[in-house]
Amino acid sequence: MIGSKLKEAIRSYSDFPKKGILFHDISPIFCKPDLYQELIEEMAKSEILNSSDAIISIDARGFLFGSCISLKLSKPLILARKAGKLPGPILSSTYNLEYGENSLSIQKESLNEFKNFAIIDDVLATGGTINCVKSLLTSHNKNISGACVVIELLALKAREKLDFPIYSTLTL
């Protein structure tokens, strides 16, 4: 049921942000508070999230889901930010996107109290972003219970590159 509602709300744009990319815009979800709330409720049911000690949410659209879900589940929220956005000692890693390269950072001290993490993001495309967070966590002997995303782009086969459970509310 939620999948069909999301499919109706999401808009797709060809050749954005680069020629050859089909961009799925989730912005219309936020103009429909009932749908946004239903999506948060649905994602929060995931065993992946419920079995974690903390949630890591990915800059920037992942924050829109991670913050709501962490409050709903009373789980700590850790932000994976783009390079240059976090003060203090950080862990950083670079990854490839469908359309370029990017880096993510996590404040080192934010990981100290926790062992098992769930990752939240808006879209699972190539798996590069989520794998970047995984490498940051595993380099510090942390576990990943899995990842939760709003949309999974099946044609890009990211799931094959990830060695942990994935929960997606909509597959395209």
Curated annotation (Swiss-Prot):
EC number: 2.4.2.7
Catalytic activity: AMP + diphosphate = 5-phospho-alpha-D-ribose 1-diphosphate + adenine
Principal location: cytoplasm
Protein name: Adenine phosphoribosyltransferase
PANTHER family listed in its UniProt record: ADENINE PHOSPHORIBOSYLTRANSFERASE
Keywords: Cytoplasm, Glycosyltransferase, Purine salvage, Transferase
Enzyme class: transferase
Gene Ontology molecular functions: adenine binding; adenine phosphoribosyltransferase activity; AMP binding
Assembly description: Homodimer.
An example Gene Ontology CC term for this record: cytoplasm
GO biological process, one term: AMP salvage
Keyword Glycosyltransferase carried by entry: yes
Function: Catalyzes a salvage reaction resulting in the formation of AMP, that is energically less costly than de novo synthesis.
Compartment(s) of residence: Cytoplasm
InterPro entries attached to this UniProt entry: Ade_phspho_trans, PRibTrfase_dom, PRTase-like, UPRTase/APRTase
Family according to the record: Belongs to the purine/pyrimidine phosphoribosyltransferase family.
Gene: apt
Pathway stated in the Swiss-Prot or TrEMBL entry: Purine metabolism; AMP biosynthesis via salvage pathway; AMP from adenine: step 1/1
